[in-house]
Regions:
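Signature of the SF2 helicase/ATPase Hel1-core->accessory helical subdomain module
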Residues: 231, 237, 258, 341-358, ...
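Metal-dependent nuclease catalytic cores that hydrolyze phosphodiester bonds in DNA/RNA
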Residues: 1-78, 108
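Conserved pre-motif I regulatory segment
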Residues: 173-220
Length: 827
């Protein structure tokens, strides 16, 4: 029997953790601050103190061989010659309330490390020391207990005996899982064209010899071939061969999570003996069973019965779920279990994930530096990553590593705090004055209406004279300054320093006044401050600082222009990663921005008959901003020709809501007999579903929907058959020119000379190709794609067309379009 690998912390917390979920403000970033203080205490201990000592040992309980491992915070020999295991804990608990028996888990960790080290070194006795560091007062309290090795070994053995039934359950499951996955058959009678090739690529990536940074694969596969099953099936087969312990299916939106759930359900339906546990991770706000009056989770034991006593009941809930035999733990199943056992569904799904084989969730569970799953990704593991709709990852990753802070947050906090003097009020005022001076500096550097710009001094700094109320402030040299926005390559330390100084008094106030009326507003401010300060710690040459003056407000953004090193680091936590989409063109662009320059990239051709797709372009229409007014009428005429060619459902995609609205108003005035439907901004899930329901099969009347490229209907929508028989794409999808996009352009111009491509052309054409992919979804589908813009005839854009667009026809005018459409539908 293979040894059961068991981290010390997992063993101790699983068995001994008790009590409730309590998300009240604790005053510090536990992970980052705790690690910093650990290093501080370890360094202060001096010579002879060994820090972060890796320990591993073999033990047996109930016939199960265990490998127990972990890192002891410190090991040293005291003046009496006794070996001491030091366990360091950082706490916000007031020093007077810190007790020796405050947390049994703390002693247990030290005692297990003592057992491992004692046997390893042949010691007869050891001491275990708990070192508590109080983060507000810097008080250090230490407690020491004396043990014989025999006592420590007995303690560890007792823990293992308690854990053994859980280990046995998991070992039996893994054996059963391995047998079933190795024999898993493809759940359909035959592969669709292209599916076998895609599955083969993914299987080879997952079973390749592990490397330090993991194997990377980029797969472009046409819409409609069944990508979800084509990547899931081979990855699961790889796990069946022993290549991979868990599979993480990561998505950009909920709709693709459902696709993964459905694919796994299909595998279960086709194989009644399939042993597979899957869990879908859903945001806390969406699964909360006991929100407060404003609809937000209230994770306090005195307010939520599902938080109160959670750790006392969660293992009972886990046992019931793991033994129920279904293995499918989606949102509905978890809600039922949470109600049955009175446990928080969000924390339950996280705890359950450690016992599951497939984990389905948003990108942020792997890539976001704040909310990623530390239990899996703080160190590398035998994980397989499937990244769906990977064309969305560059922008999502940029957003995850960026941060913003507004002066208005300080103003609102001051207002909420009210009158009176306090340390916090003073710190708020200093930060507010710094941002006020920053706003004035930006307004001078980047005047909106003809004001003269300031000049740099010899140091490269921009200095502005202040006043008694508003002191002078220095900003780094501006790399870009226009229309109220300034970009700097260096951090604006003059703005960040007062925010850093605000942290301590803000923490103190939040801890001391938890019931104050202003608590919610100041807690929001605290998190905003922490967010921007964390981003400042990551800040390097891949970032730019954006300062924007809007009226009386100043917005500071630390923008991640290039997320490649951060994505690379996240993917390195696993064995292999397959990133797939219908649109990963050009592949070099995606490999570069996602930190995988050496990754293998494959592009599969469309399996669908070319004659089923009518593909036309009217290059006589220009949708450039200056020609938009002149383009409205010709676009309406082209849309009318498309929608009148055959009764059915159509979609027209535009680069913006404003442009959409202009054309829609003209179209409905001139073609009132054609039914229309407009995508409104900010649609929720219900609104999205209602919109799509209008695209019914076998329509008796024509419906023309107006949507936005890159929006919720421009991708991730499956309208097969005659639910959608045509779409028009207005423009080449270029992002709107903005200071941010210009900084992206400048950055990549400096990197590789392709700034316009990286910032505008390639992201825009991705939206075009995604929108066009809504039309042909199955082998039997027949439909039309109409391109409306003269730039589609330019080689820089045409070279980005997929191979199955070789038959694209460029037409002279609407009259010729009508004839082509008539002929297409007559065939």
């Amino acid at each position: 029997m293979p040894a059961f690998r068991l981290p010390v912390r997992q063993l101790v917390e699983f068995l001994l953790r008790t009590g409730s979920i309590d998300s009240r403000f604790t005053g510090f970033d536990r992970a980052n601050e705790g690690a910093r203080i650990h290093r501080k205490l370890q360094k202060a201990a001096g010579e002879g103190y060994a820090a972060e000592v890796f320990l591993s040992g073999e033990r047996e309980a109930a016939g199960i061989p265990f490998t127990i491992e972990g890192r002891a915070d410190g090991i040293f020999t005291d003046e009496a010659g006794v070996t001491v295991i030091d366990e360091i804990k950082t706490t916000a608990v007031p020093a007077d309330d810190i007790a020796e028996d405050m947390n049994p888990c703390h002693w247990a960790q030290g005692m297990v490390y003592g057992a491992l080290y004692g046997r390893q070194q042949g010691l007869e006795k050891l001491d275990v020391r708990l070192t508590y560091y109080q983060i507000d007062t810097d008080d250090i309290l230490r407690f020491v207990r004396h043990f014989t090795l025999e006592e420590l070994e007995a303690f560890l053995q007792d823990l293992l005996e308690q854990y053994a039934p859980w280990a046995q359950r998991q070992l039996a499951w893994k054996e059963r899982r391995g047998v079933s996955l190795s024999a898993l058959d493809f759940p359909f009678p035959a592969y669709r064209p292209g599916q076998r090739a895609l599955a083969g690529e993914v299987y080879r990536a997952c079973t390749a010899a592990p490397s330090k940074s993991g194997v990377r694969l980029f797969c472009q596969a046409p819409t409609g071939i069944g990508k979800t099953m084509s990547v899931l099936f081979p990855a699961l087969r790889a796990i069946g061969t022993g290549c991979g312990e868990k599979l993480f299916y990561l998505t950009a939106r909920n709709t693709t999570q459902s696709a993964a759930e459905d694919a796994i359900a299909r595998l279960r339906a086709s194989d009644s003996k399939l042993a597979l546990r899957s869990v879908t991770l859903t945001a806390k706000e969406k699964v909360c069973l006991h929100p407060d009056a404003e609809g937000h989770p209230a994770c306090l034991p005195e307010l939520c019965p599902y938080a109160n006593g959670y750790y006392d009941r969660v293992n009972t809930a886990l046992k019931a779920l793991l033994d129920d035999g279904t293995g499918r733990f989606d949102r509905a199943a978890l809600a039922d279990a949470a109600k049955q056992f009175t446990v928080c569904p969000f924390e339950l799904e996280l705890d359950l994930s450690e016992w599951c084989d497939v984990i389905i969730g948003d990108y942020n569970y792997l890539f976001d530096p704040v909310v990623h799953l530390r239990r899996f990704f703080d160190s590398a593991g035998d994980w397989l990553f499937l990244v769906d709709e990977a064309h969305n990852l560059p922008e999502r990753a940029r957003a995850m590593y960026s941060a913003r802070f507004c002066k208005s947050s300080l103003t609102e906090a001051k207002r909420a705090l009210g009158r009176g003097k306090s340390t916090l009020k003073t710190a708020l005022s200093k930060a507010d004055k710094a941002f006020l001076a920053g706003r004035k500096a930006v307004s001078t550097l980047a005047p909106r209406r003809g004001s003269t710009a300031a000049e740099e001094d010899d140091s490269g700094q921009t200095s502005l004279l202040g006043s008694a109320e508003t002191p002078a402030i220095e900003l780094p040299a501006a790399d870009y300054a226009q229309d109220g926005t300034v970009f700097c390559k260096e951090l604006p330390s003059a703005l960040l320093a007062p925010l850093r100084a605000l942290t301590a008094p803000l923490q103190d106030w939040l801890e001391d006044d938890p019931d104050a009326e202003a608590h919610a507003a100041l807690l929001d401010l605290y998190f905003e401050v922490q967010d921007i300060l964390r981003a400042s710690e990551r800040y390097d040459e891949h970032f730019a600082a954006q300062l924007t003056a809007r009226g009386s407000d100043l917005e500071l953004q630390l923008l991640c222009l290039d997320p490649s090193p951060f994505v690379d680091a996240s993917l390195s936590a696993g064995r292999a990663a397959a990133l797939f989409s219908a649109t990963l063109t050009p592949p070099g662009y995606y490999r570069t921005v996602l930190g995988c320059p050496e990754a293998r990239a494959v592009a599969l051709e469309s399996p669908f008959p070319a004659e089923n797709l009518g593909l036309y372009c009217l290059p006589s229409i220009s949708t450039r901003y200056r020609q938009r007014d002149a383009s409205i009428r010709p676009i309406s005429d082209a849309l009318a020709a498309l929608a009148s060619s055959r009764v059915g459902n159509y979609l027209a995609f535009f680069p913006s809501y404003a442009y959409l609205r202009q054309v829609w108003e003209d179209f409905t005035a001139r073609y009132p007999d054609i039914g229309t439907l407009v995508q409104e901004s900010g649609l929720d899930d219900a609104g999205r579903a209602a919109f799509l329901e209008r695209f019914s099969p076998c329509p008796e009347k024509t419906l023309l929907g107006f949507g936005v490229m890159g929006g919720i209907f421009g991708e991730g929508v499956d309208l097969a058959g005659d639910r959608l028989i045509g779409c028009a794409i207005v423009g080449v999808g270029l992002p709107q020119v903005s200071p941010r996009q210009e900084m992206l352009r400048r950055y990549y111009d400096a990197q590789n000379g392709a700034g316009f491509d990286y910032a505008y052309r390639w992201p825009g054409m991705n939206k075009v190709l995604q929108a066009a992919g809504r039309v042909i979804r199955t082998q039997e589908d027949k439909g039309v794609v109409l391109l409306l813009d003269d730039r589609f005839a330019q080689s820089e854009y045409a070279r980005l067309f997929p191979k199955h667009w070789r038959h694209l026809e460029y037409l002279r005018d609407t009259k010729e379009l009508k004839k082509k459409l008539e002929d297409f539908w007559a065939e």
